[in-house]
């Protein structure tokens, strides 16, 4: 974990990337904000009621005098953001509805990112995943050519680092969706200094089993390879693989001779949200890997979701990762 963060901090040094932390009334978030403010790579923008945030800072003995603190209900930016929101939603929200929605810290914070007044957002310490992701999907939206966002985890143990996806967002995936996730995961790997070798997982290796689920992954492999070639993406994408064939060279040699990947994958695309979510938790709980995420990919600007059980360190680390995404 330290290795990844050190690489990112080096990239971010002197950049002062603006990251919105909507949950300024949460002590973990406010503490992390003061730690980030002391760096030259992330400048936090904290949202919340001034009186409550200042009272919390006093209670925690935190100096927030240099932190930008915005109350969505009273901010002079609100009128501008309301108009921008109404235009963005194209008839799906009246000005009155927008006024009400932008009292919500996640909607207000997301609008700061959309309006270019911030570079990214980290929320979820006191909100559900839906509360964090919904405004991003409505306002920031997905990149051109990408139909969905997805959630990856960095799985880290010592100097070993993998990416698992999708582990957080999409309960229903077709071949096109899996292909998009494979390509976006490869791009994420590149942006974090990895050489992406993407294995698309199944209970079958190179046609060893037959079912509709296997066919879906096989079709996804072809689509992902085609998309990567069109975009001149420097990545290897291959499959379908059982997990052992994707990660153990000796098994790959027996099960998938001649495959582009020979047990050296570092990015794993699971065939379903069930498999991805279970898989990362097994690696975390039984394998002893640190799970960093979910890191959302596919959006026009970075928005990331914390667990409500997060620590101060989690808020700090995810803010650094979000800032690094903003530089892509």
Swiss-Prot record:
A Pfam cross-reference name: PTA_PTB
E.C. designation(s): 2.3.1.8
GO biological process, any: acetyl-CoA biosynthetic process
Pathway: Metabolic intermediate biosynthesis; acetyl-CoA biosynthesis; acetyl-CoA from acetate: step 2/2
Localization per record: Cytoplasm
GO molecular function: phosphate acetyltransferase activity
Catalytically driven reaction(s): acetyl-CoA + phosphate = acetyl phosphate + CoA
Organism domain of life: Bacteria
Record's keyword terms, sorted: Acyltransferase, Cytoplasm, Transferase
GO cellular component terms, semicolon-separated: cytoplasm
Family membership: Belongs to the phosphate acetyltransferase and butyryltransferase family.
PANTHER family reported in the protein's UniProt record: PHOSPHATE ACETYLTRANSFERASE
Classification via NCBIfam families: PRK09653.1 (NF007233), pta (TIGR00651)
Protein name: Phosphate acetyltransferase
Organism of origin: Staphylococcus aureus (strain MSSA476)
